[in-house]
Amino acid sequence: MNTKRIRRDWNAQQRPVIGGSGRAPRRGWRGRVVPLLVVALVLPVVFAGWLWFHVDSSVHRIDAFEDYSGRPEAAAGTNWLVVGSDSREGLDPETAAGLHVGDASGQRTDTIMVAHLPDNSTVPTLISVPRDSRVPVPGQGRTKINEAFAVGGPHLLAQTVEQATGLRIDHYAEVGFGGFAGLVEAVGGVEMCLEGEMHDAKTGQTLQAGCQTLEGPDALTFVRMRYSDATPRSDLDRVANQRRFIGALVSEASSITTLINPFRAYALADEGAGALTMLDSDGPGDLLSLAWAMRGMSSGGLVTTTVPVTDATASKWDRQKASRLFAAMEADDPVPEDLIVN
């Protein structure tokens, strides 16, 4: 055997190729693209999970509604009590002046709504309860429903609504003046088309006719206005405008332009968490269910109306019509057409 030749061949195999770089071969395009795709897929999931945690940990909480003698039994679907309070908590005098909300002390309801999310294929329902409605308030006799919140907060209001409607309230969501304005600002304002000029004789604020983007202060003016030639039915026109605006706000908040923009999505989640008061038994998933149902308002996927009343003062309910409305909601049945008034 020629051992010298074998040794030369072995040494040649160990030498680097002349002119070679000695580096590992470059990765192909797949090696560069795949990691980027993984990051692109994982980051949104991580961001969404963080937003979920942020909302859940930042929202204001109150104790869950307790049972009491005569409380309505749970029925079909799920019922939300949605409240807009005139709370000025956290607003300094300058901010309150900029929002044109005055400086009244105490806390009252500026908006009372009941949202019914059915278990079947029936369209969800959102009804406004006029705040001047005179109903029995536990411990207070027959008085304005607004008084329940002023005296006993969310729990007495929920009990009052339950006894007046026969509907069991499962969830609660409340937003104050400052929180509402912040939500509107977080989505970049909400576009509304006004048929005519709206001038509020009480606050002196004016909204021009035509399509426009309403920012926080103007949005508050729109949803609160009832002393105006543009709202001849006073509170009945006001609550109709509130439902109209909330539908547009939810549509904007759930739009693809908002959801794919991390800065706007964060601002919305942050403002929403800071603005909302919910039951300690409620979570982000419950809130998403409500938002998903309400986003159909502008497209006809949500029935909206007001509790039937006997006159423009909206203080006395039409008991026969109101009973039919509440019975339909309790049974997950469609709301009769003659009860849908906007």
Question: Model-flagged regions — what are they?
Answer:
Residues 2-342:
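Non-catalytic, solvent-exposed segments at the cell envelope interface
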